[in-house]
């Protein structure tokens, strides 16, 4: 089973899926979904459309080239004679390649997000510097807060305070409703 790649977003196009467009010069374009086909017809550049792999790689959001994957991604159209030893080594190599790729990807994302924390901190400091009056308390309030001492309340006083506070009932006036009969009779009189 051959899995093609989408010309626009570089996603996988499985057999029986997607759209294939063949130009007059017999150049074949495969698209995974109508979204990609429409963007291609609008002559959009995949490197400038944010959700494509080309954009992500161009802007340093994904690894550009991984040599570990180059071995598995190569196409071999010429059949090779079966050899048990070769198959065993390739299976081991495939497992190893996936481990190496996963490790490299983790390191790439860690390195990519490492500067994010420092950048957020810097932006927060800049915001505070711009809005100094908002983030600082007035001097009068600071002094009164320091002068007040915490009061220690015994359990007995605490329970007495709770008992004193009783819920206050507020009467709610309900609207008076008219009978349906009285409404009907009044409307009948108006019609005559």
From Swiss-Prot:
Involved in the biogenesis of the 60S ribosomal subunit. Ensures the docking of nog1 to pre-60S particles. Activates and recruits ATPase afg2 to cytoplasmic pre-60S ribosomal particles. It comes from the Eukaryota. This is Ribosome biogenesis protein rlp24. GO terms for molecular function: structural constituent of ribosome. It comes from Schizosaccharomyces pombe (strain 972 / ATCC 24843). It is found in: Cytoplasm; Nucleus. InterPro entries: L24e/L24_sf, Ribosomal_eL24, Ribosomal_eL24-rel_N, Ribosomal_eL24_CS, TRASH_dom. Belongs to the eukaryotic ribosomal protein eL24 family. Residues 138-192 are annotated as: Disordered. Residues 154-165 have a biased composition (Acidic residues). Residues 174-183 have a biased composition (Basic residues). Keywords: Cytoplasm, Nucleus, Ribosome biogenesis. One of its GO terms (biological process) is assembly of large subunit precursor of preribosome. The keyword Transmembrane helix does not apply. Its main location: cytoplasm. PANTHER family: 60S RIBOSOMAL PROTEIN L24, RIBOSOME BIOGENESIS PROTEIN RLP24-RELATED. The gene is rlp24. GO terms for cellular component: cytoplasm; nucleolus; nucleus; preribosome; preribosome, large subunit precursor. Associated with nucleolar and cytoplasmic pre-60S particles. At the end of biogenesis it dissociates from cytoplasmic pre-60S particles and is likely to be exchanged for its ribosomal homolog, rpl24.
